[in-house]
Regions:
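Internal alpha-helical scaffold of NAD(P)-dependent oxidoreductase catalytic cores
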Residues: 35-43, 106, 124-215, 272, ...
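Interdomain hinge/lid region at the active-site interface
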Residues: 212-267
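Short, hydrophobic beta-strand segments that form beta-sheet elements in well-ordered domains
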Residues: 27-31, 87-90, 135-136
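Rossmann-like NAD(P)(H) cofactor-binding subdomain of soluble oxidoreductases
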Residues: 44-123
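NAD(P)-dependent dehydrogenase/reductase Rossmann-like domain
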Residues: 261, 265-288
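NAD(P)+-binding Rossmann beta1-loop-alpha1 motif at the extreme N-terminus of oxidoreductases
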Residues: 1-54, 58
Length: 288
């Protein structure tokens, strides 16, 4: 089976390079940017296709590795040539339903999402061997798609079209939103006189240790800190020291920490903490 890519960005190039490293046959790339397609073809030692018609007719499976908001548009251009093919995209949020009227072409559609951050065209492929791929799409061939990745050593998971958005939100929280939390902590360290290098290194060590605990014990058993202890005075001092934007972010996260704390310590009284984090409308803290 020959696999090719419409779109020559980070995801398409990384997948192509990875597939080749695992012995898969990759035809090459087509892109509206000839320079990008040429670079991708050279990097993977494959072909640069000159048109959508050419790449589809030469391939058995075609990945649409274009920006999420362009998948449907590019599919409309490709649809007249897609007869009896396997069509896929790598969007986390979109399902295979974005390939409209695909049944009329005799092709089968899939969304195949690598659960990882693909940040570099040259190097990200090297980490794909330890990545989970979530698969959604036409059930007639889905077991073969799963086997394709299993044979390369990847973990796979089926997901329904209805759950794609919630799944992608979860992935964004664990990846992108964690960056935002780290960024806030970094800013505070810099305000305290740490150098950027110190802030990066020491906060990384702290975050890494916590992630390792979560991986080993789960969120509930890993929770520590002032919210878990019920230390309302410390939490209040934290919020008093923050500007409005950071305070709001801290507060929303602390509410979730309180939910975890109450599960960890069901016999502990968190009423005072709850009043700080979620004061009643008539309370003094809610007055403007």
């Amino acid at each position: 089976m020959q696999i090719s890519f419409i779109g020559a960005g980070k995801v398409g190039v990384s997948l192509g390079k990875y597939f080749i490293s695992k012995g898969r046959k990759v035809g090459g790339y087509y892109s509206l940017s000839p320079e990008s397609a040429a670079w991708a073809a050279n990097f993977t030692n494959t072909k640069q296709y000159q048109s959508i018609k050419e790449i589809i007719s030469s391939s058995d499976m075609i990945f649409f590795t274009v920006p999420d908001d362009k998948i449907g548009e590019v599919w409309e251009t490709a649809k007249p040539y897609a007869h009896g093919k396997i069509i896929a995209h790598c969007s986390g949020i979109h399902s295979s339903n974005i390939f409209s009227d695909i049944d009329r072409t005799g092709s089968m559609a899939y969304s195949i999402h690598p659960l990882c951050a693909v940040s570099d065209r040259k190097t990200s492929w090297q980490a794909l061997g330890d990545v989970l791929f979530t698969i959604e799409g036409d059930e007639r061939n889905i077991s073969n798609i799963q086997n394709m990745f299993a044979q390369m050593g990847n973990r796979t998971c089926f997901i329904s079209a209805e759950n794609k958005i919630k799944y992608h939100a979860a992935a964004s929280l664990a990846s992108n939103h964690m960056t935002a939390v780290f960024f806030m902590a970094q800013k505070l360290f810099l305000e305290c006189g740490f150098s950027m290098q110190q802030a990066n290194e020491e906060l990384y060590r702290l975050a890494k240790g916590n992630l390792e605990n979560i991986h080993a014990q789960g969120c509930i058993n890993s929770l520590t800190g002032p919210v878990e202890r019920g230390d309302k005075n410390t939490v209040q001092k934290h919020m008093d020291a923050l500007d409005a934007d950071m305070k709001n972010a801290y507060l929303e996260n602390a509410k979730l920490l309180l939910e975890i704390a109450e599960q960890k310590n069901p016999d502990r009284d968190y009423a005072a903490m709850r009043e700080i984090l979620m004061p009643t409308e008539s309370g003094e803290q809610c007055e403007k």
